[in-house]
Amino acid sequence: MYVRIVSLAFIAGLLALLPSSAQNAPSGMMGSPGKSASHAAPHSTDPWWKHAVIYEIYPRSFQDSNRDGVGDLNGITRRLDYLRDLGVDAIWIAPIYPSPQVDFGYDISDYQNIDPQYGTLADFDRLVAQAKKRNIRVLMDAVMNHTSDKHPWFIESESSKTNPKRNWYVWRDGRAPGEPPNNWLSLFGHSAWQFSPRTGQYYYHYFYIQQPDLNWRNPQVEAAMFQMLRFWLDRGVAGFRLDAITALLEDPQLRDEPVLGGTNAQGDPNLNEIYTNDLPGNHDIIRRMRAMIDTYPGDRLLVGETYVAHTAQLDPWYGGARHDELQLPMDTLVGLDKRLDAGRFRRLLSEAQTELHGGQPLLVFDNHDQIRSWDRYGDGVHNAAIARIIAALLLTSRDAALLYQGEEIGQITATPSRVEDVRDPIGITGWPKEKGRDGERTPMQWDGSAQAGFSANPHTWLPVTANYPTVNVATESADPQSLLNWYKRLIALRRSSAALRDGRTVMLDASNPHVLTYARTAPGGETVLVSLNMSAERQTIPLGLAAAGLHGTQLRTLLASPAPVTAAAADRRVTLEPFAAWVASVN
């Protein structure tokens, strides 16, 4: 589903308190190098997903193994060792089903096979088996709101009003000759109704014309889609990321949406989607889906694409206090913004702890639909330091964490400068107000060789970003101070620390609007302090651990950027350099 969000020289006077090993760390970053981490959290009986680091793979752009310029399944298998060494628990693979590729795989013509450009079912089975050997689980992208108009179901449905598949889609008469049934709009522009001359009726499509919506009020549709999920569960997938899950049902009375005023990128009026999005009946479907996947062993997972306006609106997607729907709705409020605002982060992280009946958020800063966080949060000067702050926030918060390929090396958004170069249909129809999503989907930058090591074909499906000779996995792997090694250290610390795995969050001094400081404290007493200076100025803050009811008198630096960083008495004032990130244990 497409929703674009636009919307250390450190404590120098106390340096002598640092252990000598920390003082000798490379300048720019502290902490031991990122080794391959065990994927089993020590002494934890929680389901695997509760503290997971999930890595989104956009398969067209990850790794090409057959020289056609498009990434594929065997390319993913080739890079599993990299993902293991990074420390991820699971990979979510964007759609790889047979598809006409109008929306690059989100228009599916066969739910139980693999698109030939990505490989075969045998390639997929090999990927799952090889990932399992590395303690990496595989999640599929389940696109359940709609199919391709080339799917056999829709071809049958469109053929006749009396066809048995007719009611598998949403068909209606126009409200007048030549007029659609109501004012509903497609997310990608213009009317959400398409006239079919074969039967003289309109079909509903929330997305592209070529993506007709399934009629989830028909029990046969639910049965067929649940069977599709079983097909992949039986092949060993660990669960699903559910695309556009808030849009499964529409108002059966077809009432017009309220008009808000103004126009969107396509020139259509802005509507309040109260009749096409987030209808209560969606939750009944998800509850039945959860009951079905719970019959499988191994803590199978449902992740939901859940864009909401307020944190409390995520709670129903867990099933409220019952926790019988999604295990991990995506919390996009924290990360899919562009304001590096400590007060805003403090409020949203606090809400996630108090308003979700104990539900575990899945924090998201990057995905295949959003301008990369490097560009959204960066100021053009301090982007590298800000990227470390974002990583620390993502990986030390009380959450499951979602990474998007390339985020860990600082890939940038490479938006086309000419409409002639755009591949994404939303960029073609919305140009220049909306330039599409090509910029965040450019090929993964593996090394400094031609095409960044992504493909041996000089004509890749999207151009490789020009900075690949210096921004790539190979270069950053060899640099202890790189963003990639910062991510590895954070993930390893997250896995080894009971406080970061299981601890509650205690927000500390809020008097400085530029600094976010919080403690994670585990039931057994371990406490980890996180302090992030979100400004270009040096900031001095009181830590205030005792005032927050936390015990401990000494701090020991675990990770810091920039370095060196000192330990300090827990209630002293601390000076943070511009855009500093500091993680410390409280003893």
Predicted regions and their residues:
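Sec/Tat signal peptide C-region and signal peptidase I cleavage site
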Residues: 20-21
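Loop/helix patches that line or flank the sugar-binding groove of alpha-linked glycan CAZymes
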Residues: 49-50, 253, 257-278, 284-299, ...
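C-terminal beta-strand-rich structural cap/linker in extracellular carbohydrate-active enzymes
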Residues: 567-587
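Bacterial N-terminal signal peptides
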Residues: 7-17
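Acidic/aromatic-lined carbohydrate-recognition and catalytic surfaces
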Residues: 25-230, 234, 247-309, 444
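Hydrophobic residues within beta-strands of alpha/beta enzymes
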Residues: 91, 240-242
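Beta-strand-rich binding/interaction modules
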Residues: 538-561
